Amino acid sequence: MMPEIKFIIAGDFSQLLPVKDRIEDCNYKDSMALHELCDGNRLQLTKCRRSDATLYNMLLPENINNIKRKDFKNKMTDRHIAFTNKKRIEINKIMMDQTIRNKKIKALELKALDYDPNSQDVRLCTGMPVIARKNSKQLHIFNNETYTIKEIRRKEDEITVEDGGRREHTVPIPEFTKIFNVAYCITVHKSQGATFDEAYTIHEFNQYDERLKYVALSRATDINLINII
C-alpha cells in the first residue's frame, strides 16, 4: 500500500457507458471505489470551458431531449460523426473520392482487411485525416488518436503521418490499414474526448439516445459549428 499517492480522476458521467461492461446499471459516479480513490473528494464544474453557454445549456439533462435537428445547420462538411460503422464507411468513401477528384492526383489504393468487416478499401493522399485502430509501441502510435497523412513514399513503401503535436511517425504501407482507419468520419464512440473547433456533420441522429446526443453535440466549441443531416 502507498497511502501517500493522490489520485486526480477527471471525467464526464453524461458520456457513453463502457462498451460490453460486465456490470449492469452500475452507478460509477457514487461508487465506493471512486470515493475511496479520491479520498471522498469530488468537484462538480459548473462552467463549460469547451463550448459557448448556449450549447452548454442546451445539453443539460433537463433540456437535451428537447433538441431537434432543425435547431442546427444541415450542411455536408469535411468532418463527420456517425452512429454505425456502415455509415462511417459510406461517408469516408464519399470524402476520399471527393478529395482525390478535387486534387486531380493519383491516389495510393489499399484493400480492406479481409478479417475485419469494419475495415474498408482506401484511396490515400497527403492531407487526409486518419485515426489509429490500435496501439503500436514500436511506432509510437496510440489507439483512437487522430493523425494527418504528411507524405506517401511509394518507392520506400512507407507513409509518414503527423500527430497533433506535429510529431512524425513513419508506417510501412503494407501495415497501414492494420493500424489506421480513414477519419473524415468517425463513430460517436471514437469521438469521445475530441474537441472540434471546425464545422462538422452528424449523421443518423434519429438513432441517438440521450448519451449519444450529448457526446456528438458536445464536441463543438461553438453551436454554429454543428450540422445534422
List PLM regions with ranges.
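Conserved ATP-binding/catalytic motifs of P-loop helicase motor domains
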Residues: 1-229
